[in-house]
């Protein structure tokens, strides 16, 4: 609807940029005729908008459209129904497919400068910078960033696109979610406008597509993307893609498309380690103009292990409650405020889950993983599971030992040290470790 962008423009002039970016930009509007629904990605944003911005939103919408009846909901704006087919006797001229325009579809907030580098993402950062500096180079075209949700893949993609535009303001950089590519193609088929659809991709300098796992099982979509990919690759136009796992692991993707995706550079983005998580919390706090003591950042980093999005959610909750109550942010305040969130996080990754995930990964029975047998095929996975339990949970060494058939805490400590040492020289073990971390963080 037209009124919401106008309303958002006014709100941007009235509220701090960090507040608008955090609470208002994620909203999607749906006009239901007699009312307007604003959809938010989660309940926390709904609560903040209701408490802090809803009265002003109602005033502005009433001013722009004469209707201030606004509802808030969690979810995504429903897709518009497909238009009824035109009468056969009066065929309409085909229209261009509704592709996202070149300008304005990249979020300028995401840059290389505000991306927090760590061991888990440094290769991805370096690859994205190279793609922005030397677009189309065969060494990183296509560039595929893969990993679980909320680890910074889209940030790197946006940063590369923004860097391309900064170096060449005339560059036509197109960003699409995979669902948008699919929807645009369907619309083009309905409108008999596939030629226009294909021409739009031939005119761009770089194509950025998020979450290509969505293409799985959609044969026609994969066919069109395959041809689009070939045209861009042959024209040395940069392609940057993201996926929630290594593409060869995605069932339903055609072999020829998997082969194309392997032509360039594929980089895993792993869950951040403790130091990187703490640095992210401190950096995000600075962006919001909030004062966060180091020990609070360390607390959040220690407890929230899965992804960057969860770290940001915890920080937003903390800062919002501090602003509402006027209290200082201390470790005690953080523990009180985030109690339920931290408990849920702890329960999500427990020792039984780690044991089952490791057993399944190595093709073992749980009874064998926990047995006293010391054959190499059992001992190494058992050590990996113990080390993961130490890395991902708050359990003590004796508690971990008890969970592994009553083993002594010194056995657990030896396993942790052994795995850390071996990973420095054993690439396969390091790969296993990172894959298990990703599985447990999903």
Curated annotation (Swiss-Prot):
GO annotations of cellular component type: cytoplasm; plasma membrane
Cell location: Cytoplasm
Record-linked InterPro entries: AAA+_ATPase, Chromosome_initiator_DnaA, Chromosome_initiator_DnaA-like, Chromosome_initiator_DnaA_CS, DnaA_C, DnaA_dom, DnaA_N_dom, DnaA_N_sf
Superkingdom of source: Bacteria
Region of interest called Domain IV, binds dsDNA, as start-end residue ranges on this chain: 323-442
Protein keywords: ATP-binding, Cytoplasm, DNA replication, DNA-binding, Lipid-binding, Nucleotide-binding
Residue ranges, annotated region (Domain I, interacts with DnaA modulators): 1-68
Stored SUPFAM superfamilies: P-loop containing nucleoside triphosphate hydrolases (SSF52540), TrpR-like (SSF48295)
Keyword Cytoplasm: yes
One BP term from GO: regulation of DNA replication
GO molecular function, one term: lipid binding
Ranges where the record places region Domain III, AAA+ region: 105-322
Chief location: cytoplasm
Subunit structure: Oligomerizes as a right-handed, spiral filament on DNA at oriC.
Family affiliation: Belongs to the DnaA family.
Role: Plays an essential role in the initiation and regulation of chromosomal replication. ATP-DnaA binds to the origin of replication (oriC) to initiate formation of the DNA replication initiation complex once per cell cycle. Binds the DnaA box (a 9 base pair repeat at the origin) and separates the double-stranded (ds)DNA. Forms a right-handed helical filament on oriC DNA; dsDNA binds to the exterior of the filament while single-stranded (ss)DNA is stabiized in the filament's interior.
Protein name, UniProt field: Chromosomal replication initiator protein DnaA
Species assigned in the record: Xanthomonas axonopodis pv. citri (strain 306)
This protein's encoding gene: dnaA
């Amino acid at each position: 609807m037209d009124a919401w962008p106008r309303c958002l423009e006014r709100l941007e002039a009235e509220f701090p940029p960090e507040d608008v970016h955090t609470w208002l930009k994620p909203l999607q509007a749906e006009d239901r005729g007699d009312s307007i629904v604003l959809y938010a990605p989660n309940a926390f944003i709904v609560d903040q908008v209701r408490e802090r911005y809803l009265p002003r939103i109602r005033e502005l919408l009433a001013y722009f459209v004469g209707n201030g009846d606004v509802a808030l909901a969690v979810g995504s704006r429903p897709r518009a129904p497909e238009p009824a087919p035109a009468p056969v006797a009066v065929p309409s001229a085909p229209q261009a497919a509704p592709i996202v325009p070149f300008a304005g579809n990249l979020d300028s907030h995401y840059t290389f400068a505000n991306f927090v580098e760590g061991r888990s993402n440094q290769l991805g950062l370096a690859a994205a910078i190279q793609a922005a500096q030397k677009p189309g180079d065969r060494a990183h075209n296509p560039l595929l960033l893969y990993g679980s949700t909320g680890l910074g893949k889209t940030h790197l993609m946006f940063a590369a696109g923004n860097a391309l535009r900064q170096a060449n303001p005339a560059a036509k950089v197109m960003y699409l979610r995979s669902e948008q590519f699919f929807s645009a193609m369907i619309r083009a088929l309905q409108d008999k406008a596939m030629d226009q659809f294909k021409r739009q991709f031939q005119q761009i300098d770089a194509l950025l597509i998020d979450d290509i796992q969505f293409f799985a099982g959609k044969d026609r979509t994969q066919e069109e993307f395959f041809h689009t990919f070939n045209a861009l690759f042959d024209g040395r136009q940069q392609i940057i893609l993201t996926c929630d796992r290594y593409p060869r692991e995605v069932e339903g993707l055609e072999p020829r498309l998997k082969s194309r995706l392997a032509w360039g550079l594929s980089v895993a983005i792993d869950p951040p380690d403790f130091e990187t998580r703490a640095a992210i919390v401190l950096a995000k706090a600075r962006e919001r103009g909030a004062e966060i003591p180091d020990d609070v950042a360390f607390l959040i980093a220690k407890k929230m292990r899965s992804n960057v999005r969860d770290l940001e959610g915890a920080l937003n909750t903390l800062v919002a409650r501090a602003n509402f109550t006027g209290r200082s942010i201390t470790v005690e305040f953080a523990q009180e405020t985030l109690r339920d969130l931290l408990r849920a996080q702890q329960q999500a990754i427990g020792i039984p889950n780690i044991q089952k995930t490791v057993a399944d990964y190595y093709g073992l029975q749980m009874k064998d993983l926990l047995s006293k047998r010391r054959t190499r095929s059992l001992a190494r996975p058992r050590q990996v599971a113990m080390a993961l339990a130490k890395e991902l949970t708050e359990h003590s060494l004796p508690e971990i030992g008890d969970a592994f058939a009553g083993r002594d805490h010194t056995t657990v400590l030896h396993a942790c040290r052994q795995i850390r040492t071996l990973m420095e020289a054993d690439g396969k073990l390091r790969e296993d470790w990172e894959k298990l971390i990703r599985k447990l963080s999903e």
